Regions:
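N-terminal signal peptide c-region/cleavage motif recognized by signal peptidases
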Residues: 15-19
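Short, exposed beta-strand-loop hairpins at the edges of beta-sheets
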Residues: 93, 100-116
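Short, surface-exposed alpha-helix to beta-strand junction/turn motifs within ectodomains of secreted
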Residues: 44-46, 50-72
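Short, solvent-exposed loop/linker segments at the N-terminal edge
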Residues: 35-40
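Cleavable N-terminal signal peptides
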Residues: 9-10, 20
């Protein structure tokens, strides 16, 4: 009986430790990675696996040539929210685009990455 309890307690601790030390992973991007869109998207929305620290989260958009694209209203939905978004105020011309993001999760881990999409009406 004692061995079962110790095994159960150890398993619980390992599961808890795994979630505590997890980094925020990008789970959903809109536009989706590799998507080809018929029209310019109105916004970028990135959903992560962990809560985010709003003051330390940023997203940028650039044409494949590296030319930056203006974004408006960059925001995280609030303390602990998992969504980082920004509006695209002007229609994008046809071409390839790169979304770059840097976030700090509520557990203090920094992560970054990219996502690409194409506008081809």
């Amino acid at each position: 009986m004692a061995l079962r309890f110790v095994t159960f307690a150890t398993a619980c601790l390992l599961c808890a430790a795994t979630s505590v030390f997890a980094h925020a992973r990008l789970t959903i991007s809109d536009p989706a990675e590799g998507a080809t869109l018929r029209a310019s998207p109105p916004a970028i929305s990135l959903t992560f696996s962990e809560g985010l620290e709003p003051a330390f989260c940023h997203v940028t958009l650039a044409a494949a040539s590296g030319e930056p694209v203006d974004l408006d209203r960059e925001k995280v939905g609030g303390d602990g929210s998992t969504i980082l978004s920004a509006s695209i105020p002007n229609s994008l011309v046809p071409g390839r685009y790169v979304v770059k993001w840097n976030v700090l999760s509520t557990d203090g881990h920094k992560t970054s990455g990219t996502s690409k999409f194409t506008v081809a009406p």
